[in-house]
Swiss-Prot record:
Its cofactor is Zn(2+). This is Acetyl-coenzyme A carboxylase carboxyl transferase subunit beta 2. GO terms for molecular function: acetyl-CoA carboxylase activity; ATP binding; carboxyl- or carbamoyltransferase activity; zinc ion binding. Keywords: ATP-binding, Cytoplasm, Fatty acid biosynthesis, Fatty acid metabolism, Lipid biosynthesis, Lipid metabolism, Metal-binding, Nucleotide-binding, Transferase, Zinc, Zinc-finger. The keyword ATP-binding applies. Binds 1 zinc ion per subunit. One of its GO terms (biological process) is malonyl-CoA biosynthetic process. InterPro entries: AcCoA_carboxyl_beta (IPR034733), Acetyl_CoA_COase_Trfase_b_su (IPR000438), ClpP/crotonase-like_dom_sf (IPR029045), COA_CT_N (IPR011762). Its EC number is 2.1.3.15. The gene is accD2. Pfam families: Carboxyl_trans. Residues 26-281 form the CoA carboxyltransferase N-terminal domain.
């Protein structure tokens, strides 16, 4: 008869080795809570089951989650080829291939229930959703179209800020889009922003924070300058929840934090309340 062996729990090092041997597609680590989870557990909405953080989604997937139908506008608009920086032009081509878009924002007219609205969704796979001249032009055209047609606008923001390769031309888009937003507001029309991770830089400093109703996904990073830049400037370490959606909500900068699976229903309810109709959604 063989003697019984005592069970020994694996050491941290053994666990680390086992994790390293797990196929990449099987597990996903949340960038916010740093917990590992099975990729299939993220579900169709790609949400961390531990902290509700929403992983970054392609623009077209966002559109499918938020609308019943969608008609894209200005699909061919892209950065002018007059830029004389070969490295930048090469980056643009890689971004187009990765995102299947010609620019860092997808714009068009969407429908949800009986409501029609302008929709802009920023694409992080296109140079981190950076704000370039063509990006600003597409968003401006969206607001101008919706002002003419008396439609509300919904913007889903996700950006690293103004596109540095385009210099002042990119920075000018902040004022350009803000003017279009102001004209839309003067016409008495609704503007809803949905801030997602990350919304930073010139996008935060302009149209992302100009919504009449401002929503955000849980744990989204929202700010202007990056954390390291701020640390070096003030010579202090900001708190762990610095620039997170929950902190902005607590300080009055947001109206509501909405989990990704509930965004469509919340948007429909807001359109019902503001555009007229039965509130049975």
């Amino acid at each position: 008869m063989m003697p019984k062996r005592k069970f020994q729990a694996p050491t941290e090092r053994q666990l680390a080795v086992r994790r390293d041997n797990i196929p990449d597609a099987l597990l996903t680590r949340c960038p916010v809570c740093h917990e590992d989870c099975y990729t299939q557990d993220l579900g169709e909405f790609k949400v961390c089951p531990h902290c509700d953080y929403g992983f970054r989604l392609p623009a077209w997937q966002r559109v499918q989650q938020l609308t019943a139908s969608f008609e894209e506008r200005d699909a061919d608009l892209s950065a002018p080829v007059s830029f004389d920086d070969p490295a930048y032009l090469e980056k643009l081509q890689r971004a187009k291939a990765a995102s299947h878009l010609n620019e860092s924002v997808l714009t068009g007219i969407g429908t949800l229930a009986t409501y029609q609205f302008g929709l802009g969704v920023m694409e992080t796979k296109f140079m981190m959703g950076s704000l370039g001249a063509a990006t600003g032009e597409k968003i401006t055209r969206l607001f101008e179209t919706c002002t003419t047609q008396k439609l509300p606008v919904v913007m889903v923001t996700a950006s690293g800020g103004a596109r540095m390769q385009e210099g002042a031309r990119a920075l000018m888009q902040m004022a350009k889009v803000s003017t279009a937003v102001a004209n839309h507001r003067k016409a008495g029309l609704l503007y809803i922003t949905i801030l997602t991770d990350p919304t930073t830089g010139g996008v935060t400093a302009s149209f992302a924070m100009q919504g009449d109703i401002m929503l955000s996904e849980p744990r989204a990073l929202i700010g202007f300058a990056g954390r390291r830049v701020i640390e070096q400037t003030i010579q202090q370490t900001p708190p762990a929840d610095f620039q997170r959606a929950e902190t902005l909500l607590a300080n009055g900068w947001l109206d509501q934090i909405v989990p990704r699976p509930a965004l469509r229903k919340t948007l429909q309810r807001l359109l019902t309340i503001t555009q007229g109709g039965h509130q049975d959604v």
